């Protein structure tokens, strides 16, 4: 009888070592296949029906928040039935993350009257949640209503130590061409946070058409030189609420098939343009040629 001598290559040895693991995987389908199912579901977006169902889940705040976010970022997220849900959550929701998502949604799809519903939430006397206060201030950048000016000013000039909220409030005030707003923004230039200074200066520039930087003294001198205060805002520029923008990363230039699109700055609901003006993000029309 001739004996056979088997020679094992490194590749064969590694295969034999993996065999017990593969066998265990086949004998434990409840673990392995469930894991693959979870991975697959993570790449499959939820349907509008599922998003709406999650947004109304009475037991799971995480699902409610996720559902609200998905609905509010969809094209149909401004339907009346969803607006009523956002408003209800702004008023009555107990989970701060769900309420913050609802405030953001209402800022995106709401009306000028909704600014009245949102404005109390920028105050530290109403909520301790910094996130809620910040998203409320951001939402008010998108909704124009002069009735909220007083509360915006109060937050900007208060002794509160929340710089992010104050900076967002300073941006929102850039919509309102009022003397009291000008004075409040001057105080914003003295804030110890640079972000508040920069946003206050930008709002002053939008309101007046002037460029005096971060110097409160220079802005005050310009103000004092204006004999007719009724013409203080004669050079006002159109206000556009800011949106998230970023440059492409290096691999996005290579992967040209990846299409990234971002929301473009626009004017708040309820704010009529000062005059016919083609903004930076508008397409040219026949009248412009």
Identify the role of each PLM range.
Residues 64, 98-99, 129-133, 166, ...:
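Residue-level detector of extended alpha-helical repeat arrays and alpha-solenoid scaffolds
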Residues 37-55, 76-91, 111-124, 145-158, ...:
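Amphipathic alpha-helical scaffolding segments comprising HEAT/armadillo-like alpha-solenoid repeats
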Residues 32-35:
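Bacterial signal peptide processing site
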Residues 59-60, 94-95, 125-129, 160-162, ...:
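Short inter-helical turns and helix N-cap capping residues of alpha-solenoid HEAT/ARM repeat scaffolds
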Residues 212-258:
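Pro/Ala/Gly-rich low-complexity, hydrophilic intrinsically disordered segments
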Residues 27-30:
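C-terminal motif of bacterial Sec signal peptides marking the signal peptidase cleavage site
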Residues 67, 102, 136, 169, ...:
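Conserved hydrophobic register position within alpha-solenoid helical repeats
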């Amino acid at each position: 009888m001739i004996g056979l001598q088997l020679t094992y290559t490194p590749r064969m040895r590694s295969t034999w070592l993996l065999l017990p693991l593969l066998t265990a995987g086949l004998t434990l389908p409840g673990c392995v296949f469930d894991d693959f199912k979870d991975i697959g579901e993570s790449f499959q977006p939820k349907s509008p029906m599922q998003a709406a169902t999650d947004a109304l889940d009475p037991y799971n705040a995480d699902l409610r928040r996720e559902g609200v976010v998905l609905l509010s970022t969809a094209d149909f997220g401004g339907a009346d039935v969803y607006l009523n849900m956002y408003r209800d959550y702004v008023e009555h929701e107990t989970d701060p993350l769900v309420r913050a998502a609802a405030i953001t949604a209402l800022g995106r799809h709401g009306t000028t009257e909704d600014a009245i519903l949102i404005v109390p939430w920028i105050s530290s006397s109403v909520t301790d949640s910094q996130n809620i206060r910040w998203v409320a201030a951001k939402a008010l950048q998108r909704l124009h209503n002069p009735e909220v000016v007083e509360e915006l000013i109060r937050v900007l000039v208060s002794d509160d130590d929340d710089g992010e909220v104050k900076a967002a409030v300073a941006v929102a005030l850039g919509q309102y061409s009022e003397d009291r707003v000008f004075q409040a923004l001057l105080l914003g230039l003295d804030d110890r946070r640079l972000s508040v200074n920069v946003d206050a200066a930008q709002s002053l520039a939008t309101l007046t058409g002037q460029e005096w930087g971060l110097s409160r003294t220079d802005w005050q001198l310009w103000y004092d030189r204006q004999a007719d205060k009724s013409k203080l805002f004669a050079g006002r520029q159109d206000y556009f609420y800011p949106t998230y923008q970023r440059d492409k990363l290096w691999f996005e230039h290579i992967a040209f098939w990846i299409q990234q699109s971002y929301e473009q700055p626009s004017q708040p609901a309820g704010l009529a343009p000062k005059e016919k003006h083609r903004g930076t993000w508008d397409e040219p029309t026949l009248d412009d040629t």
